[in-house]
Amino acid sequence: MTDNLQDLISTKLAAAIANPLFPAVDSQLRAGRHISLDQLDNHAFLMDFQGELDSFYRRYNVELIRAPEGFFYLRPKATTLIARSVLTELEMLVGKVLCYLYLSPERLAQQGIFSTQEVYDELLNLADENKLLKAVNQRSSGSDLDKQKLAEKVRAALNRLRRLGMIHGVGEQNSGKFTIAEAVFRFGAEVRAGDDPREAQLRLIRDGEAATPDSLALEKQADLNEVDDNDELEDELDDEEHA
């Protein structure tokens, strides 16, 4: 039995799975959380076993990615066996604003601490307020009630991003204060190659680009078509070999 297991799993992968850190790290990754350098033990664990764990997760049609900024996350393919959730357009936009704030001089001036109100104010400053209100309520008239609902949605978006490891709470639980993690660069990958990262991120915010269920469906269909094409190619090669 042991010999058969060794044929299926490498010694180093077995050591990774047996590590007491694995259950918590695995659960966090599967839940969509990003593991940054500030999680010293978990991050060091992933650094030590990155190759082995990437092979492990590929069996579920996901990849273990280490971003240029150093954080880890699971990137699912369309055929993933691990449940994936889609961020709303507002959540994506809030993420882009967080990336913009991360790049701002204010981050150093404020010791990296921001508030929910600052994110809300920056969102209104950078994006089209009417479009934001319409995203919350198609019949929005710009009333105080509509703005209150938008503020509630922004708070909910920040809570969702906190669970994904994008921000970390500071102080009391309901203080609304937080620091921004490097993982927000998931929303700003396009800015890495730009001459001015903040200007590039500002363009992304104004464009309001986001993944939607329709775009994900198209992605999945493209992947399935690629699989079908590969199967057909293999069949043709088999026919040629037997000819």
Curated annotation (Swiss-Prot):
Gene: mukE
GO biological process entries: cell division; chromosome condensation; chromosome segregation; DNA replication
Family membership noted in the UniProt record: Belongs to the MukE family.
Cytoplasm keyword on record: yes
Keywords: Cell cycle, Cell division, Chromosome partition, Cytoplasm, DNA condensation
CC per GO annotation: cytoplasm; nucleoid
Assembly notes: Interacts, and probably forms a ternary complex, with MukF and MukB. The complex formation is stimulated by calcium or magnesium.
HAMAP family (UniProt xref): MukE
Its biological purpose: Involved in chromosome condensation, segregation and cell cycle progression. May participate in facilitating chromosome segregation by condensation DNA from both sides of a centrally located replisome during cell division. Probably acts via its interaction with MukB and MukF.
Biased composition (Acidic residues): 225-243
Localization terms from the record: Cytoplasm, Nucleoid
Pfam family, one: MukE
Region listing for Disordered, in residue ranges: 214-243
InterPro entries for this protein: MukE_C (IPR042037), MukE_N (IPR042038), Scp_MukE (IPR007385)
Keyword Cell cycle listed: yes
Top-rank taxon, per record: Bacteria
Protein name, UniProt field: Chromosome partition protein MukE
Organism per entry: Pasteurella multocida (strain Pm70)
